[in-house]
Structures are given as C-alpha cells and as structure tokens.
Amino acid sequence: MARKTPLNRIRNIGIAAHIDAGKTTTSERILFYTGVSHKIGEVHDGAATMDWMEQEKERGITITSAATTCFWKDHQINLIDTPGHVDFTIEVERSMRVLDGAVSVFCSVGGVQPQSETVWRQANKYGVPRIVFVNKMDRIGANFYNVENQIKQRLKANPVPINIPIGAEDTFIGVIDLVQMKAIVWNNETMGAKYDVEEIPSDLLEKAKQYREKLVEAVAEQDEALMEKYLGGEELDIEEIKKGIKTGCLNMSFVPMLCGSSFKNKGVQTLLDAVIDYLPAPTEVVDIKGIDPKTEEEVFVKSSDDGEFAGLAFKIMTDPFVGQLTFVRVYRGKLESGSYVYNSTKDKKERVGRLLKMHSNKREDIKEVYAGEICAFVGLKDTLTGDTLCDEKNAVVLERMEFPEPVIHIAVEPKTKADQEKMGVALGKLAEEDPSFRVMTQEETGQTLIGGMGELHLEIIVDRLKREFKVEAEIGQPQVAFRETIRSSVSKEHKYAKQSGGRGQYGHVFIKLEPKEPGSGYEFVNEISGGVIPKEYIPAVDKGIQEAMQNGVLAGYPVVDFKVTLYDGSYHDVDSSEMAFKIAGSMAFKEASRAANPVLLEPMMKVEVEVPEEYMGDVIGDLNRRRGQINSMDDRLGLKIVNAFVPLVEMFGYSTDLRSATQGRGTYSMEFDHYGEVPSNIAKEIVEKRKG
C-alpha cells in the first residue's frame, strides 16, 4: 500500500484558542465542510446538507480524538486538538511539539486574553508558524480592527490581514479577499456551503485598497525580486502574493489574519484555503532535534519516507472499545501494523497491534503509517507521553520532555468501599494520560493524594473520575507542595559502625554540602582518590543521600537545589557493605543539612487579575495581604490588569473573594512560576504544624 497523500500535501495543524473563542465550533465546522460529500459550490437543494448537519448534531461530531484527519482540495489535514486552559499548559506544550503550524482563534469581542498570551508564547518557543482567525464576527461588539491592534500591542506580533470583514454583528455577510480583490458572500440558505464571489461593495473599496497595499508591502519585503518589482511601481500577480504570504508566515516575520463566524458558517472555507496555502508541510519545517542514546550527541531527524522509523508519542487516551490508544507523530520512515518498535526513552521493545486513523465520525484501520502522519497505535504497554518510538538500528531520543512537578495536592477518598479498587485503577489510567498529574499514598495516614498544576486541574480530574469511570470521590483540603533547601556550605563526617561480635557494619564518609541555583536540582560529585572508599560503595552513598533528601530536616519536605561532594572516608575489609555506606551517607547528609541554614520554599504563582478601575485599590490591597509582590499594572480595553507573584498557599478560594470584591466583574488567571523562600515567621508556623 503506497502512501495516498504525498508528504508535501500534508498539514499537521492545531487550533489554539482561549476557552471562549469558539475553538470547538471552528473545529467542527472544518470537519463538516471537509466531510461534505458533494463539492461545495455545486447547486444542491439546501435540504440535503441541512439533514446531514441535523444527523451529525444528533450523533454529535465533537472532536473527542487527539488527532482527526480530514481532506480539503487534495490535501490531508490532521487536526490536533489543543486544550484551552492554563492548568493544562503541559498539554498545549506537548501538542505544540507535534504541530507544524497553528490556527490561533480569537473572539472578535474578547480579543487577546491571558490564556491566549500563554499559548502564543509557547508557539513562539517551539517556532510554530501560525495564521490568525478572528471568530464570532456576528456577535454584538464584534470588531476585527480592535483585535488586529491587540495582537500588535499585547502579543508584540505583526498581523497582516489577508481578508477583511463585510459588515459586523448582524450585518456580517462575508469577507473581502485581499489577494484576489473580490468579495466573498455566504449564502444563508445552504448553511454556508455555497458562497458567491462578487465585486467589492463601493463603500468598502477605499478600505480594501488600503489593506491590500499593506499586504503587498509586507509580501514584497520577503523577497528582493518582489521588492524591486514593487518599488518600480509594477503590480504583483496573485501567485507572487501567495508565495510571499507563505514565506512571511513560515519565517514568522508576519502573521496572516482572517475573519469569519464559525457558528454562522461563514469564513470556514477561506480559512481552510489559507491552511493549505500558507501553513507548512512537514517538509517545510526545520529538522527535529534528537539525541543519539548511545553517544548522547545531538542528531537531526529529517522528515522523509526514507530512513528508519522515528516517531513521538504525544498523547494517551483510553478508548472503551479498543483499550489504550497511543497517539504518535511520525517524523521519519514508515511502520507496518503488527511489527515491533523500539522505545528508546525506556529502552524496551513494543509490538504494535493495530494502527488506527481517526476521522471525525469513524476509525479506519490502516496497514502502514508514513512520515508526517499522525496515527493511534494500539497494543503498546510501556510507552508513555513524551516517549520516542524508533527503529533499533538507528535509535534516537526525540525529546527529553521536562514535566513540571505538581504544586498542589488534594486527598481523595472513594465514597463507598466498592469504589476503592475502581478508583485506584481509574487514577492510574488518568496519570498515564497526563504526566503533570501524580498519584501517591501518604505514608502516615494511608490516604490517596493526587497532585497537579492547580485547583482547576484537580477539579477536572475528580469530575472525570465521576463521568468516565463512575467513581464518586470525596476530596479533602488542598495542600501545598512545600520544598526545603540550604543557604550555606558545610562539611560533615559520619562514621556508621556496629562491631560487637559476628558480622559487623562499617561505613565512614566525609561530605561537603553546598547550595545551588534555584531550579538546578541535585548534584553528586565523587572526589574519592586512592581507594579510601572502594568504587562499588560510592553509588550507595549517593543512594543514601537521595533517600534522605525526600524528608528534609525542617518539616519533612523534599530538599532541592544542592550539591554534595564526597571527598574522604574509610572502610573495613570485612564489615563494610553497601548498606553501611548508604546509612553513613544518609546520616551525614542529615547532620550537614541541619548545620547548613535550612529554609522552607513555597510555590509562587504568576497571577494576572483583570478588573474595572474602581476596584483597583481593593484588589491590590488584597494581593498585598496575601503576601503578593506586584510586578506591573497595565490597561486593557478599559480594564486594569495587575500582574503579581503570589504564594499558592494564599490563593485558595481567591475566585470567590475576587467575585465578591468586584461584584463579579473581575477575572483572574494563574500559573506556577517558581519556588520562593517562605518568610521566617510563617515558616515557623508551618514547621510547628507539621511536627504538631
């Protein structure tokens, strides 16, 4: 079976948006128009199309899949779903890794919101080219040009409209295509399946010419030959303009911008045309960086059908019919179903039972998957999100994804005994799907704790327990994940010796403990020379320290950001053992940390509050009471924006307090930023409470 769509006709795109910008509707409409069996533009009685929509409504094409395949004008588009909430930035980051391009959807009324800024930053970080779709042009207060300004000011981007709206709110009927210089007007009777290409309305001609001029200028800057032609006063032809838009979009010097109303079925086809005209094929993006697991050297993986198979597992979902689905983006080579594949991240072989391609309303079993495609693998047992699957002959690790540690924990209890086992299984499955979510058992109380990136993240997990796994769970008070670290350097020795008849125990170490940069983690350095401690006992010392650092000396929280140097010691021919050196290492570490000026650290959240000016004073006063540090204040659409770092422990219940302080007009978003030192008076309370 040869590949159906050549690599240069594939588009892997994501639709990234703030929660209310209309992402789902846009995705659904894309699937609707690409799935319509007749060619759009043939004359049909609108009824057939209408029925199709109604049926789909009853069955509901909601994109529940992580990646859906559809076709438009001989191109294959793989739509990768990206979540729209800040607690799930890990998901967004991961989908950014496997996308080649993105459509950023903004609401024509709400414009650029805090979440859209986060997603935009992540797309910049991974170098994802994008086009902007201004949605909801039919809403009251819709203003395309406002959004254009906000993108310039807030996202510091360079938007270049390639179509502009005809009308707005309830008079929005279509768009002016600035490349062709024609008006495109949608026909309400056919659910927008049919549209007419007309001359530009006279009252908009001036504006259209003005924006066309901006577009041509932006295009000319992409290419010297075009620039000469433009400066010489010659007209650029349509092909040249399209080529220039694509160049500018791919090198991210500007962002093509379109508008429409997905809900009212206007502007979706023009958006699809822009996706295939301007967003990159897998062959047009930079080669993917990887690491050779044998040599640890950097290697580059080129998107092509030649070469050994290499792909990245980016999402795991549990499907009621086929079990676990592992979604994989294939970067190089091809793979047949039923064959073996090597997981280079885990150093394990896995067998691929089936390969499934997801369409909006059906699944298709395929025999082979090729470079540039996205496909669900069935039958993988050990593969988790972020793992690389490849051919053992040419192994590569595509990504060492850094998954953030949870900043908040909540105890969960099943409501009935019968749910206990079900809950364990369900939490295990959810943890496999989402690496930023952790499950652990609290030793002292035996309670199950779940950890995540914020209150909302955990609320959604508890909600999924109920909906998908039918487990009713009670949740406890949220607990913050504190950490400990040290502020000064100390050297300590510890001799662990038990030698009273029979086989004794003997381990003796000298260590130096030093603080490191915040966020840099733990480092162990071996400076033993002349065999004063035999080689085979060195890892035991390291292991002893790693076990001891899980329980800090202040309040039993994990200790972070320090370096231990093992520089001297002694051993006994008969009585020394790994166990003895492990204990010696762990005791030396505990004694050293007591003397090294230990301090408590807490998660600091980056908080952004948006309020009308009259509540500004109250909100800032409240953030100060919560030990917040105010970083900046801005204006946005007549509202005041306050940016601050606030300790997570002070933020519980903030949404209710903010609502009552601003009569429901204030909104906020927060995400974890860094660990900061807890002031000593508060640290004292926390320590006393822990030791209780």
From Swiss-Prot:
SMART domains assigned to the protein according to its UniProt record, in alphabetical order: EFG_C, EFG_IV
Locations listed in the record: Cytoplasm
Matching Pfam families: EFG_C, EFG_III, EFG_IV, GTP_EFTU, GTP_EFTU_D2
Residues covered by the tr-type G domain: 8-283
Entry's Gene Ontology cellular component terms: cytoplasm
List of residues binding GTP: 17-24, 81-85, 135-138
Function, in words: Catalyzes the GTP-dependent ribosomal translocation step during translation elongation. During this step, the ribosome changes from the pre-translocational (PRE) to the post-translocational (POST) state as the newly formed A-site-bound peptidyl-tRNA and P-site-bound deacylated tRNA move to the P and E sites, respectively. Catalyzes the coordinated movement of the two tRNA molecules, the mRNA and conformational changes in the ribosome.
Family: Belongs to the TRAFAC class translation factor GTPase superfamily. Classic translation factor GTPase family. EF-G/EF-2 subfamily.
NCBIfam families for this protein: EF-G, PRK12740.1-3, PRK12740.1-5, small_GTP
Protein name stated in the entry: Elongation factor G
Taxon lineage: Bacteria, Pseudomonadati, Campylobacterota, Epsilonproteobacteria, Campylobacterales
Name of the coding gene: fusA
